[in-house]
Amino acid sequence: MKQIINPLKGNDNKIPIWFMRQAGRYLPEYKKVRETTKNFLDFCYDVNKATEVTLQPIKRYGFDAAIIFSDILVLPHAFGWEVDFKENIGPILKQFKSQEDFKYLQINPNDKLEKVYEIIKKVKKELPSPTSLIGFAGSPWTVMSYMLEGKGKQDFKTSKKFIYENKILAEELLNFITEKTADHLINQAKSGVDVLKLFDSWSGVLAEEEFTEFVIEPTKKIVLKVKEVFPKTPIIAFPKGAGLLYEKFIKEVPIDILAVDQMVPLEKMKEWSDKVIVQGNLDPVVLLTNKEIIKEKTYKILQAMKGKNFIFNLGHGILPETPTENVEFLTEYVRLYEEKNSNSTF
């Protein structure tokens, strides 16, 4: 049985564990492969290299799931939008400003996404059983935000101003991204992934009305469309920073697994685990500290979620400066806790 799917099958004894950005710059073996290709997107589309780095954390740590090495911005890039990644800066995109800009978006994707599906098929062949394989996409609001801003920001004033002032155009762009995202996830499932995930990194910048319109509604459309074709494929959603709106999200979006950030109280995670499987939520910065602190913080989460529908993960991605030995210690600690399953002597 696929390890990460155990909670869906009622197996409470297993604590599935994997980490966002588990294949990345904190791994020396990743850096060695990454430095062979200058352009980041070219690296994402290189079938052999992307397969290799997807499998690296599985070989090193034995996580219960591998997540395809890719990026949320391959989607707009595949539809003709200008996307580039600058060293030490991050993504730089052509800025979407008006109706005229739709002419730069193609109706059908180029062959770039086919490379992603080839990577999935190759990883699937090489992935040790019973490790799960996760495919993913950026949620429409987050992808749309990058297009409206032209790069990553913290306040997203440009994006929010745009949706306030250009409701019809914003809805048109949102619908385009929503449709293409659903298709991309369906094609990943067809290629062999076991689980799908939607990353909404910037959902936390929206007020309730806009959160409903730009996060909840498009995510719901995507989930329903995917479930029409793959009703048994679990879907994880991560509306990062949603705060109190996580509850509204759970009520209105028919997901299987809710990923939460480190700001969510453990009591809320316990409460929500009666409705969905909850994934999270160790602060990634904890992995920059020492073993005692890692043990203390991890134990609190494991104790709170003991016997619950739960997947252990971080509240966001592994930081590039994270010591590999700390990731190893954390993984072994979760395994040991699972084995002993005791709140008295452990």
From Swiss-Prot:
GO terms for biological process: protoporphyrinogen IX biosynthetic process. One of its GO terms (cellular component) is cytosol. Its EC number is 4.1.1.37. It holds the Pfam family URO-D. The record marks D71 as: Transition state stabilizer. Its main location: cytoplasm. The keyword Transcription regulation does not apply. Substrate binds at R21, Q22, A23, G24, R25, D71, Y146, S201, H316. GO terms for molecular function: uroporphyrinogen decarboxylase activity. It is found in: Cytoplasm. It catalyses: uroporphyrinogen III + 4 H(+) = coproporphyrinogen III + 4 CO2. Pathway: Porphyrin-containing compound metabolism; protoporphyrin-IX biosynthesis; coproporphyrinogen-III from 5-aminolevulinate: step 4/4. Keywords: Cytoplasm, Decarboxylase, Lyase, Porphyrin biosynthesis. Catalyzes the decarboxylation of four acetate groups of uroporphyrinogen-III to yield coproporphyrinogen-III. HAMAP family: URO_D. Homodimer. Belongs to the uroporphyrinogen decarboxylase family. This is Uroporphyrinogen decarboxylase. It comes from Rickettsia massiliae (strain Mtu5). The lineage of its organism: Bacteria, Pseudomonadati, Pseudomonadota, Alphaproteobacteria, Rickettsiales. The gene is hemE.
